[in-house]
């Protein structure tokens, strides 16, 4: 069976008409698809065929006892695949030559020109020449695009890529700046939430103070709990909706909200008047009407930039025009004082006393200290509900 012979072939696999593609029969060659050619069509008579010496062995294989596929089992040539149990000794670990223990420092990475020399050869010129290829240019400029030989966007892109690759690395972001940038809004949010919670307690505190005036020296008790409705004992400022005193509690808090709003508006008005943003014409003695018609020369803006007039003009009945400049600050306060002085003549008698009292600064300070010492505890109890409004007034004073 090892060479060419004219003797009739014997044994299994002699019938060439029987297909044997996987070669599971002894003394038969594999499928011609593995080594097929037109010169050796007769694979059973091929002198270079594989005689499969392992195919005649009888042993426990991957396909059961007494049958082992040629060229090893489907699981391979390993002893475990052939059904033989063997113990492979584990290779001992290599002996360490370093006496140091623990984590060693990471060695420095070699430069790019040593590890990837091909990357250093890919410069901008090579990249630009590659872009001249029609197949590559078609990716950047589809049908209907530019057909010129030079690709202008590619040069800009290459310059940007080259400038990016020329850097050794981007700088590490400063974590201190990032934390400070996040800390500011968080502090503002926390302060705003704190002020909001305190402001919401103002109506309840003022309501307690209001109701305590009716129970001097006693604990305020809601009178609605003594009615026919079965209501548990509660404070006068926390009436449930089924309590008859609930409507009065809502009315008191509504009035308190209006008073707080009025207080904020008064503070804003004083602030605007102090900065001269309320151009109110003062009262002129003996004037009946105020007009800006025939006296436009007197109503020119102050310093040429202000949108408010710098003076007021009056037009009496005889037709003569009188102009008085508007105060740069406290115009509205002076207007109110003049108006009150006209209505109440006795207020003019207080002007010298107020001027004398203000002129005595040590006396004024001593008086203020004495009043705070005497009435301090009572004033603190009265003004404590309004303390959360002080930061709001301060912010308005600074930013307006």
From Swiss-Prot:
The chain crosses the membrane at residues 182-202, 254-274, 349-369, 376-398. Residues 2-174 are annotated as: Pre-S. Residues 2-253, 203-253, 370-375 are intravirion. Residues 29-50, 85-118 are annotated as: Disordered. Residues 2-119 are annotated as: Pre-S1. GO terms for biological process: caveolin-mediated endocytosis of virus by host cell; fusion of virus membrane with host endosome membrane; virion attachment to host cell. GO terms for cellular component: membrane; viral envelope; virion membrane. The keyword Lipid metabolism does not apply. The keyword Ribonucleoprotein does not apply. HAMAP family: HBV_HBSAG. The large envelope protein is synthesized with the pre-S region at the cytosolic side of the endoplasmic reticulum and, hence will be within the virion after budding. Therefore the pre-S region is not N-glycosylated. Later a post-translational translocation of N-terminal pre-S and TM1 domains occur in about 50% of proteins at the virion surface. These molecules change their topology by an unknown mechanism, resulting in exposure of pre-S region at virion surface. This is Large envelope protein.
């Amino acid at each position: 069976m090892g060479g060419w012979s004219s003797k009739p072939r014997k044994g299994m696999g002699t019938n060439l008409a029987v297909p044997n593609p996987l070669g599971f029969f002894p003394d038969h060659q594999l499928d011609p698809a593995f080594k097929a050619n037109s010169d050796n069509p007769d694979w059973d008579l091929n002198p270079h065929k594989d005689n499969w010496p392992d195919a005649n062995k009888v042993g426990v294989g991957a396909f059961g006892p007494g049958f082992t596929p040629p060229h090893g089992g489907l699981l391979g040539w390993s002893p475990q695949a052939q059904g033989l149990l063997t113990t492979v000794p584990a290779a001992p670990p290599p002996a360490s030559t370093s006496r140091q223990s623990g984590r060693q420092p990471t060695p420095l990475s070699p430069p790019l020109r040593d590890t990837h020399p091909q990357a250093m050869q890919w410069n901008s010129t090579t990249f630009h020449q590659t872009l001249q290829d029609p197949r590559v240019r078609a990716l950047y400029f589809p049908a209907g695009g530019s057909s010129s030989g030079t690709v202008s966007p590619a040069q800009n892109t290459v310059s940007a890529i080259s400038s990016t690759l020329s850097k050794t690395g981007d700088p590490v972001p400063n974590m201190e700046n990032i934390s400070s940038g996040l800390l500011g809004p968080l502090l503002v949010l926390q302060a705003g939430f704190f002020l909001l919670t305190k402001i919401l307690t103002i109506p309840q505190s003022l309501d307690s103070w209001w109701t305590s005036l009716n129970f001097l020296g006693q604990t305020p008790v809601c009178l609605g709990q003594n009615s026919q409705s079965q209501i548990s004992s509660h404070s006068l400022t926390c009436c449930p909706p089924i309590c008859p005193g609930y409507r009065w509690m809502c009315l008191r808090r509504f009035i308190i909200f209006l008073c707080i709003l009025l207080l904020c508006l008064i503070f804003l008005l004083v602030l605007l008047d102090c900065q001269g943003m309320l151009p109110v014409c003062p009262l002129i003695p003996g004037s009946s009407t105020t007009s800006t018609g025939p006296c436009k020369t007197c109503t020119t803006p102050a310093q040429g930039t202000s949108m408010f007039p710098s003076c007021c003009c009056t037009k009496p009945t005889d037709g003569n025009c009188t102009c008085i400049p508007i105060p740069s600050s406290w115009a509205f306060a002076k207007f109110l004082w003049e108006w009150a002085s006209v209505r109440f003549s006795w207020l003019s008698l207080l002007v010298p006393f107020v001027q004398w009292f203000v002129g005595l600064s040590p006396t004024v300070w001593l008086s203020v200290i004495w009043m705070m010492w005497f009435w301090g505890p009572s004033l603190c109890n009265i003004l404590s509900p309004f303390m959360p409004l002080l930061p709001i007034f301060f912010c308005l004073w600074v930013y307006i």
